Every structure is written in structure tokens, then in C-alpha cells.
UniProtKB/Swiss-Prot annotation:
Top-level enzyme category: transferase
Enzyme Commission number(s): 2.2.1.7
Binding-site residues, Mg(2+): 149, 178
Any GO MF annotation of the entry: thiamine pyrophosphate binding
NCBIfam families attached to this UniProt entry: dxs, PRK05444.2-2
InterPro entries: Dxylulose-5-P_synthase (IPR005477), THDP-binding (IPR029061), Transketo_C/PFOR_II (IPR009014), Transketolase-like_Pyr-bd (IPR005475), Transketolase_C (IPR033248), Transketolase_CS (IPR049557)
Protein name in the entry: 1-deoxy-D-xylulose-5-phosphate synthase
Record's function text: Catalyzes the acyloin condensation reaction between C atoms 2 and 3 of pyruvate and glyceraldehyde 3-phosphate to yield 1-deoxy-D-xylulose-5-phosphate (DXP).
Family indicated by similarity: Belongs to the transketolase family. DXPS subfamily.
Pathway involvement of the protein, from the record: Metabolic intermediate biosynthesis; 1-deoxy-D-xylulose 5-phosphate biosynthesis; 1-deoxy-D-xylulose 5-phosphate from D-glyceraldehyde 3-phosphate and pyruvate: step 1/1
Catalysis performed (reactions): D-glyceraldehyde 3-phosphate + pyruvate + H(+) = 1-deoxy-D-xylulose 5-phosphate + CO2
Gene: dxs
Binding partners and assembly: Homodimer.
Cofactor(s) demanded: Mg(2+); thiamine diphosphate
Length: 644
């Protein structure tokens, strides 16, 4: 990387600085930004391939439009790294992106006036943009939603398309087609004809002709309609996506998303059109990094501390042990062999949910529906209705989008759909839009729903196998962290688990600690620390949040008046809420100390610091326990303990 290239990015403190650059300098800037993103993500991890693919598009957008006067609305927002570099955030905070003291991995209004919305979920940009366009239709503001091709599998995007009015001006949809999944443009003749037939002057001329034809007495409307159909048919010969014309969007494209000169020209033309436009831009995901271009899905997101040397080949860090998603992926593969009708459904998360092996082994029973969470759940309900076992694998944060589908199509029908809720708990680097800390609260309220969480790898295996026999709607939630392998209590992988039965992990006399899922390990660590103060604790894993083990806890509360609940979930509506309902129903009067995620939004951060921020680190909890219960150190701990 030359000093000339390095000096270009250092001169960019705001998008207005782009106006003074030549086309050659803009191309060098793109090269430098690519190098910067690769270099930073080598240390921090983050979304790689999508950001490498949208650099030239971002440069051209900021060159032609103003992100302070015009409105850039990024769908998902994980592809906004180049946007951050051009809007005054090429700082030390960018070098720590997704980590403590660093920038968010998504757009964030708290960071910059150039970011309009907190983002993280797909498919909402077009709806947000239409709302803004309606409120600003008499102004000079251009509204620019920027969507990837995958967003068009979202029902919300299609609903927004249906709501577009031809009267909107200064409304420009940017379609970043980085997979060529929508269309393939073949041959020089097709390219040249497409450029001519979709030239904005052709669209403008065509609309003027149609408007003039409607003024002909008696026959005007009919002639105009036939003229429009003829125009549409002509376009359909060369246009990869004639459907957009039916939604009042003039189509422009395909456009080479890595040709800055062409992009600037197209954006300048679209800027001056008096009707809504969709610009179809074709980009290469992972552009500039060979291995990411060859496998863009694998390098969509990368972990920290990978090696970017050796001819640009990235070598992801080898994980020391299996994560809960790894265990899930291995288990469903085994279940696929023993349950020949088992289907797995996922909304575009096959790689993250470790379903590639099942997909390869049982391709006819694996269904990736795209970014369509509601459809994934209802589709699964249809499979269950047809008497086939089905697991719908879905991230906790994305399950929010399928709430009505879970209620109406699964629980109300009493169908045995198994929700495998991945990424339950804090999302750390991905931040507030991705924390999986709300699902228990809305699932608890649904009749017929079983909710459980494993504390270890073997319990996850047991729950997955057992859920196929429950014949009821169920949710098995688990985090994306290293799975606890050693579990002396649970030793038989094939042990069947009936809903509503918890387990005592360790017996004590002074206090009862209830840990949810992987927090049982934290509970056992706290138990050991309390022992140094002469305090003995019983540690219990409820396993099931719903149905709750009323019998077990009724017996335990006959011997314990002090209770601690630890869960990596919102304090509203989680395990503690279920426990409080139990207390109210059975009339127990006990002192309860609850550790959960406070009722607020928490941004990204490293695991240790984020746990400390929400009060779920062991040191903070022990201090609160000693203070809350006013424990005084005993001379010697109880010897009636059985630590497992």
C-alpha cells in the first residue's frame, strides 16, 4: 500500500471531501478502504464479505448525494463499514469495531448524524424509507433505501413494494445484488440493449407518451394501457426484473457495482428523475479478497485473530471446543438417521446454525426459506400437520419477527413444531439489535408451549431427542458459546426428559441458587465462592421454564427462605417471572434476589465487560448476595455438600 493511497483516506473527514477527488483518486480510495477493512477485521472480526463488495457503491452515493440532507437507509446495516469510513469515523474507534470502546458493527444514530436508524434486522429499510418519503414529499430531500438482494425474500419488503406510489419523487431504491441470485445478464448484445431500454430518458419519454395518450377522447385510456403493456413486454425481453415496473418503480440496470464512473453517472441521472426509481447494482461479495470471493457465505462474518497473510488467504481461528450450535448440528444429523421423516427448516441461517452437514446428508429434508422468519415458522407448522417431525432452527433475535406465526399457526393449532432457538443470551459484538434476551417473555404467555434450556452439551442432546416424543409445541434455547462438556449428573445421552422436571446439582443449607441453562455453571462457581464465607448453597437447574417444576421447588422452599435466580435473559418475563408466579400461586414467602439483564438496551462489547455491565459477572453477583442477605462469614462451612 503506497503512501499516496494511504494519504487519500486520511484526507476524508466527511463525505464533502470526496467532491475534490478525481476518478483515479476515487478508485485508489476504494483500494485503500478495502485494505483498511481487511486489516481491521483481522484483529476484531466482523462482517467482511458484504462490506468489501459495497465500497464503490458507497463512494459513489456519497459523491452524488449528501447523507446529511438526503436520507441513506441501510437495510440490515452490517454493510455500513465503508459508510462509516467516509463519514468521519476513520478513527481508533473503527479499529476496535464491535469491541469495547469501538464502533458498532451496524448503523447507529448515537455514533453519527449520518446514521438514521439503529439497524441489525433485514427487510425494514423500504418501509422506513417510504414513511420518510411521505413525510418529506414536498422537500428537496432524496430518500435512498439500500437493500441487498436477500431482503427481497422478506415479506416486509414485499409489503412495502406494494405501497409505493408513482407520485413519489426523489425516491431511489438501491438494490445491491451481490449474489446474482435475481438475474444473470448474458452477452454483449443483452448488456447494450439493457442499457438502452432502461436508460432513464427512455423511461421518462415512455411515461410522457402514456400521459399524453390518456388525453385522447374516448379511446385515450385504452390506448395508454396497451402502450404500457407493449413497453413492458419490450422491456421484459431484456430486463432481468420487469416486476419492479409493476410496483411503480422505474428500473435502471444492471449496473456494474465496481465501476465508480458508471455508478456516479447513473446516480446523477436518477437524482433528477421526477418519479421513483430502482437501480439494480451487481457487486461481488468479498471483492478484493480471493478466498472471500470464492466462499462469500463462509466469509460473510469472520472471527477475530484470523491470519490475513499468505496471499490474502484467511485462516479462521480453530475453536478449542464445540459450541452449543456445533452440538445442535451434530445431534440433528444423528436424529436425521434415526427419524427418516425429520425435516429441518431455517430462515437463511444454515451456516451459523451449523446445519451444513444435515443439508448435505439429507438435502430433501432441509429447507432454507431465506430471510422469512414468519414463513419459516408457519411452513414448519404445515410439515407438522402432515405428521412429519420438524425442527425450525432460528436465532432468538429473529424469532421476534415470527411472534404471530408461533401463536396462531403453532400454539393455537397445538402442532409439535420444535423451535431450536439459537443465539439465546447476549450477542456481545453484534450489540443491542441481536441480543437474544426476550424470547422467554413472549413464549411464556402462549398456551401449549414448552420452553427449556440445556446447561450442557449432553442435556442439549437429551432435549432434542426427547422433544420428538413430546407431541407439543416446544422451544429449546441455547447460546452461541462453548458448550459445557462435563456433566456428572447427566451422563446418558439417550435419557428421555419429560417436560417440567428440574434437577438438583448440589445440596446445601443456607441458600437456594437457581441457574438457567449455561448459568448453572456460574451458579456452581458462586457456590464455591460462598463456601469461603461459610455459606452453603443448593444449586438447581430447572431445565424447563415452562412447565415449571412446581413439585421440586415446593419441596426446596420448605427448607430455603433465601433464593437467588440467575439468567442471561431480560429481567422482564423470564425465569424469575415464572418463579414469582409460582410463589404467588402456592403462597410461599421467600426473599428472592434476581440476576438478569436490566430493562434497557445494551450496546456491543467484549464478553467479560458486557457481563460486568449488566451485573452478571461472578464477582459482582457474590458482592450483591453477601450484601442483600446480610450474610456474616461463618467459622466453618457446612460439610453437607455435594458439588458436581
Amino acid at each position: 500500500m503506497t503512501s499516496q493511497v494511504s494519504s487519500i483516506l486520511s484526507r476524508i473527514s466527511s463525505p464533502t471531501d470526496l467532491k475534490n477527488l478525481s476518478l483515479a483518486e476515487l478508485s485508489l480510495l476504494a483500494e485503500q478502504m478495502r485494505h483498511k477493512i481487511i486489516s481491521v477485521l483481522t484483529n476484531t472480526g466482523g462482517h467482511l464479505a458484504s462490506n468489501l463488495g459495497i465500497i464503490e457503491v458507497t463512494i459513489a452515493l456519497h459523491y452524488v448525494f449528501s447523507s446529511t440532507e438526503d436520507k441513506f437507509i441501510f437495510d440490515v446495516g452490517h454493510q455500513a463499514y465503508p459508510h462509516k469510513l467516509l463519514t468521519g469515523r476513520n478513527t481508533e474507534e473503527f479499529d476496535r469495531i464491535r469491541h469495547d470502546g469501538g464502533l458498532s458493527g451496524f448503523t447507529s444514530p448515537s455514533e453519527s448524524m449520518h446514521d438514521l436508524f439503529f439497524s441489525g434486522h433485514a427487510g425494514n429499510a423500504l418501509s422506513l424509507a417510504l414513511g420518510m418519503a411521505k413525510a418529506t414529499e414536498d422537500s428537496r430531500t432524496h430518500i435512498l433505501p439500500i437493500l441487498g438482494d436477500a431482503a427481497f425474500s422478506c415479506g416486509l419488503t414485499l409489503e412495502a413494494l406494494n405501497n409505493i406510489s408513482s407520485n413519489l419523487s426523489k425516491f431511489i431504491v438501491i438494490l445491491n445484488d451481490n449474489n446474482m441470485s435475481i438475474s444473470q445478464n448474458v452477452g454483449v448484445m443483452s448488456k447494450n440493449l439493457s442499457r438502452w431500454i432502461h436508460h432513464p430518458k427512455f423511461s421518462l419519454f415512455s411515461r410522457k407518451i402514456e400521459k399524453w395518450l390518456t388525453k385522447i377522447p374516448r379511446y385515450g385510456n385504452g390506448i395508454s394501457k396497451r402502450s404500457h403493456k407493449l413497453s413492458t413486454c419490450l422491456k421484459s425481453l431484456f430486463c432481468p426484473i420487469p416486476i419492479f415496473e409493476q410496483f411503480n418503480l422505474a428500473y435502471m440496470g444492471p449496473v456494474d457495482g465496481h465501476n465508480i464512473k458508471r455508478l456516479i453517472s447513473v446516480f446523477q441521472t436518477a437524482r433528477d428523475l421526477p418519479f421513483p426509481v430502482l437501480i439494480h447494482i451487481c457487486t461481488t461479495k468479498g471483492k478484493g479478497l480471493e478466498i472471500a470471493q470464492e466462499n462469500p457465505e463462509k466469509y460473510h462474518g469472520v472471527t477475530a485473530n484470523f491470519n490475513s497473510s499468505e496471499k490474502n488467504k484467511l485462516l479462521p481461528t480453530i475453536k478449542p471446543q464445540l459450541t452449543y450450535p456445533d452440538v445442535f448440528g451434530q445431534t440433528v444429523c444423528k436424529l436425521g438417521e434415526t427419524s427418516p421423516n425429520l425435516h429441518i427448516v431455517t430462515p437463511a441461517m444454515s451456516l451459523g446454525s451449523r446445519l451444513e452437514a444435515f443439508k448435505e446428508k439429507f438435502p430433501k429434508r432441509f429447507i432454507d426459506v431465506g430471510i422469512a422468519e414468519g414463513h419459516a415458522v408457519t411452513f414448519s407448522a404445515g410439515i407438522a400437520k402432515a405428521k412429519s417431525p420438524v425442527i425450525c432452527s432460528i436465532y432468538s433475535t429473529f424469532l421476534h419477527r415470527a411472534l404471530d406465526n408461533v401463536f396462531h399457526d403453532v400454539c393455537l393449532q397445538g402442532l409439535p413444531v420444535i423451535l431450536a432457538i439459537d443465539r439465546a443470551g447476549l450477542a456481545y459484538g453484534d450489540g443491542c439489535s441481536h441480543h437474544g434476551i426476550y424470547d422467554i417473555s413472549f413464549l411464556r404467555a402462549m398456551p401449549n408451549m414448552i420452553i427449556c434450556q440445556p446447561r450442557s452439551a449432553i442435556v442439549l442432546q437429551q432435549l432434542l431427542q426427547s422433544s420428538l416424543q413430546w407431541n407439543m409445541p416446544s422451544a429449546i434455547r441455547y447460546p452461541n458459546i462453548a458448550a459445557i462438556q462435563r456433566d456428572p449428573i447427566a451422563t446418558d445421552v439417550n435419557m428421555h426428559r419429560d417436560p417440567g422436571l428440574g434437577e438438583i446439582l448440589s445440596q446445601g443449607e443456607d441458600i437456594l441458587i437457581i441457574g438457567l441453562g449455561h448459568m448453572c455453571n456460574t451458579a456452581l462457581s458462586i457456590k464455591l465462592q460462598l463456601l469461603t464465607h461459610g455459606i452453603s448453597a443448593t444449586v438447581v437447574d430447572p431445565v424447563f421454564i415452562k412447565p415449571f417444576d412446581n413439585n421440586l421447588f415446593s419441596i426446596l422452599l420448605m427448607h430455603h427462605s433465601k433464593v437467588i435466580i440467575i439468567e442471561e435473559h431480560s429481567i422482564r418475563g423470564g425465569l424469575a417471572s415464572e418463579f414469582n408466579d409460582f410463589l404467588a400461586t402456592y403462597g410461599f414467602k421467600v426473599d428472592v434476589l434476581h440476576f438478569g439483564i436490566p430493562d434497557a438496551f445494551f450496546s456491543h462489547g467484549d464478553k467479560e465487560s458486557l457481563l460486568k455491565r449488566v451485573g452478571l459477572d461472578t464477582e459482582s453477583m457474590v458482592k450483591r448476595i453477601l450484601t442483600h442477605f446480610n450474610f456474616r462469614t461463618k467459622t466453618s462451612p457446612s460439610n453437607k455438600l455435594s458439588i458436581v
